[in-house]
UniProtKB/Swiss-Prot annotation:
It is found in: Cell membrane. Residues 146-165, 215-231, 267-290, 398-491 have a biased composition (Low complexity). It is a single-pass membrane protein. Residues 109-126, 183-198 have a biased composition (Polar residues). One of its GO terms (cellular component) is plasma membrane. This is Probable elastin-binding protein EbpS. Keywords: Cell membrane, Membrane, Transmembrane, Transmembrane helix. Residues 291-305 have a biased composition (Gly residues). InterPro entries: LysM_dom, LysM_dom_sf.
Amino acid sequence: MSNNNFKDDFEKNRQSIDPKEHQENTQDSVNDSVDNIKEEVSDKSDEQFPPRNAQRRQRRRDTATNQREDEQSNQEHHNENNEVGDRDNGLQHEDNSSRDSNADKESNDPSQNNNLIHESSNNQQSENRHDINNEKDQSDKDSNNKKGAVIASSGAAGVGAYAASKHNDAASSSKDHNDKAHQQNQDWEQSNQTNDSTETQDENTNNHDSKKKGAAVAGGAAAAGAGAYAAGKHKGKKDKNDNEPEQNESKSDVKNEEKHGSKKKGAAVAGGAAAAGTGAAAASHSKSSTGNGGNGNGGNGGNGNNGDNNHDSEDNNKKKGGLLGKLLPIIAAILILAAIGIFGGMALTGNNDDKGSDDDKKVADNKDKDSDKAKDADSDKDSKSDKDKDKAKDDDNNQATTDSDSSDSSDNANSDSDQGNNDSQDQANSDQNQGTQDEQNSQNNQDQQSDQSQQNGQANSNQNGSSDQSQNASNDSNQQNNQSSNSNSGQRTHVVNGQNLYRIAIQYYGEGTPENVEKIREANNIQGNDIHNGQRLVIPQ
């Protein structure tokens, strides 16, 4: 950091690009296929300087932070290996760690990276090989990460088989690195160096592989065919790597491409899976994990720094692979739970909507029933009011008829009394006149002859006969009046007030039958229903 304070902006910006950072940036924007990603990485691996402007400054910051973290992690891991190793070789391990730290500082220092004069040809070759191996391993890991994300998002069916095949591939790749490290350690043994660090490294690898195996077994469900296919495929790949050692970097590149193809096949087969092949995948992975101590590929001779760099990159890759192996089942479980929660919520809300619609229908039906009841009540009230009006009219008509009957009876009584009074007065007058005439005749005709008396007697008899006749006539008239009054009292009358014969018959007879209507017609000489308001009708008994 102190050296950067004395550099100008141009020298500060002349920093090399970390290939891992390149790999992550390019894979975020490219999603077509793994082959295209590898081609772009290989094309951009030769670039030494970032583009200018804002992207350059941002990449410079990210690169500086990533280099600092890598340096710390490599230093810590190397210190652990130094503590585990034998105390007899402690000085040599310290020398190796110092050389590794010097190599890391030289690679991290931008001035040292750009000043190619101070680097030896062996260091250049080892660092170039280290960068290429890191690029390919990182590309394989990122492609596997993308495949894992796609399969995990599609459901829990292919998670287990993919995790098993992925960790088998990680185990086979780590086995290749371990074989290289073992070969280099054998070269160091020829130069009076022990392989205690290699044995501890193998133990760490076995422990780490067992952890990954547990994560793969806990990862959930996969198909039986997919697990068996992945097991056979990677077992054959392990045997091939054990029996056919590779001698140069071109063959290792071909091996990585084939390995990547096998990963694609394993992921594709595991995509349509169910929950039966977890055991087979775990068994195949356990076989591949126990085979780490076999005959490894013979790498280039190189120097000690190359072996240490490969060793550090292996450990970093193993750590990242272990984290991914633990995270994949967790992500798949979260996705499954989220899908179950979504469908459950949809089902519950659907049921609630149905219940709400049923409640609305019930409320609407109740409202309709209430409205019908209200209408019925209104109609009942109207009918009652009509009946009350009819009763009031009938009562008025009955009262009118009773009034008319009473008036008729009073008129008849008055007429009878008047006639009786007249008759009595006439009879009294006639008797008085007769008496006076008799007295006059007796007084005036006392001296007349008997003839006159006879004539007077005849006249008196005639007068008496006429008076008797008048009295009989008056008696007959009285009898007729009595009969008429009796007939009037036996028959009823009705004054028409906006009614028809049917209503009148119902009022007086209780039934509107045609016989009752015909009685009223005959009594009043009516043809049809020809009546008018105010007409007085006789209602027979």
